[in-house]
UniProtKB/Swiss-Prot annotation:
GO MF annotations, alphabetized: rRNA binding; structural constituent of ribosome; tRNA binding
GO process terms (BP): regulation of translation; translation
Membrane-crossing segments per the record: none
PROSITE patterns with a match to the protein in the record: RIBOSOMAL_L1
Residue pairs linked by disulfide bridges in the UniProt entry: none
Keywords attached to this entry: Repressor, Ribonucleoprotein, Ribosomal protein, RNA-binding, rRNA-binding, Translation regulation, tRNA-binding
Family indicated by similarity: Belongs to the universal ribosomal protein uL1 family.
Subunit structure as annotated in this protein's UniProt entry: Part of the 50S ribosomal subunit.
Protein name: Large ribosomal subunit protein uL1
Amino acid sequence: MAKISKRRQAFEAKVDRQKLYAIEDALALVKECASAKFNESIDVAVQLGIDAKKSDQVVRGSVVLPAGTGKSVRVAVFAQGEKAEQARAAGAEIVGMEDLAEQIKAGQMDFDIVIASPDTMRIVGTLGQILGPRGLMPNPKVGTVTPDVATAVKNAKAGQVQFRVDKAGIIHATIGRASFEATALRSNLSALIEALQKAKPATSKGVYLRKIALSSTMGVGVRVDQATLAAQ
């Protein structure tokens, strides 16, 4: 068994795994535990009351976090003509068509997100085996296949995050950095929860948001009392 570091032991001692913490206390604990030598991510795990094995209960979407993610994002866009110019004006680092596809096939993928105009999917569709496993394949469900490429680029730059439920029925997302003020993290968490509520499958029965836990990159999970999320 791997030896538990003193730092980890200190975190474990501070957090009661069975307790539901008010959002203010949960954020304070998570930020306190984020004492690594780098600006740790603040992550959230949301257990949903769905059956992830059923295709009609797959929860997927995107949301622009009001306080951003604290990360700079490089955007590649498949577009031509006027839409290509609009994408560049919006801040896209890479814009192209067949030339961009060839770069990707050659392993040149210096970007974090791919956006595509619908008329380019004949090209993008050939890249599924490359982009898909990396989570980069454009999809209309998360707003990355759209005729309004300029807005999609701006959203990506502004702090848009994509979410998709895993096989265990859990959504994992980053809502900021340890350097963020607690109010900013709370605002981002509220935006994500609202987006998840809107994405609730019609066939989902019972309690939808079952558990919410926050953690930093090197910290431990802190469960959140959902009743305190509604209080401003």
